[in-house]
């Protein structure tokens, strides 16, 4: 007969690695070309003037300047870079 209890099993005990999403440069802050402004899943924010979008929906600056957030009439959030 066994003198130790069985090990048992569980379906818990896993967690995914952090993805560090969110806004990396706030409105009014100065950025250089290529700087990441927002890391996101899906297009919560869309690129405006002088901003680009990566394949993972990351918004980045195309020129040196200041970050400007704006809303359109149909509730879209755009990010512009105002050249300095």
Curated annotation (Swiss-Prot):
Q: Which GO terms describe its molecular function?
A: structural constituent of ribosome
Q: Which domain of life is it from?
A: Bacteria
Asked whether the keyword Ribonucleoprotein is assigned, the reply is yes
Recorded hits in SUPFAM superfamilies, A to Z, give: Ribosomal L27 protein-like (SSF110324)
Q: Where does the record place the region Disordered? A: 1-29
GO cellular component labels: ribonucleoprotein complex; ribosome
InterPro entries linked: Ribosomal_bL27 (IPR001684), Ribosomal_bL27_CS (IPR018261)
UniProtKB keywords: Ribonucleoprotein, Ribosomal protein
The yes or no answer to whether the keyword Ribosomal protein is present is: yes
Q: Name one GO biological process term.
A: translation
Put simply, this protein is called Large ribosomal subunit protein bL27
Q: Which organism is it from?
A: Chlorobium phaeobacteroides (strain BS1)
Q: Gene symbol?
A: rpmA
């Amino acid at each position: 007969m066994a003198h130790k209890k069985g090990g048992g099993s569980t379906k818990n005990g896993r967690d995914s690695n952090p993805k560090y999403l969110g806004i990396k440069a706030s409105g009014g802050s100065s950025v250089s070309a290529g700087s990441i402004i927002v890391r996101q899943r899906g297009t919560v924010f869309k690129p405006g003037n002088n901003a680009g979008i990566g394949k993972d929906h990351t918004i980045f600056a195309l020129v040196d300047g200041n970050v400007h957030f704006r809303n359109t009439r149909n509730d879209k959030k755009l990010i512009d870079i105002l050249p300095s």
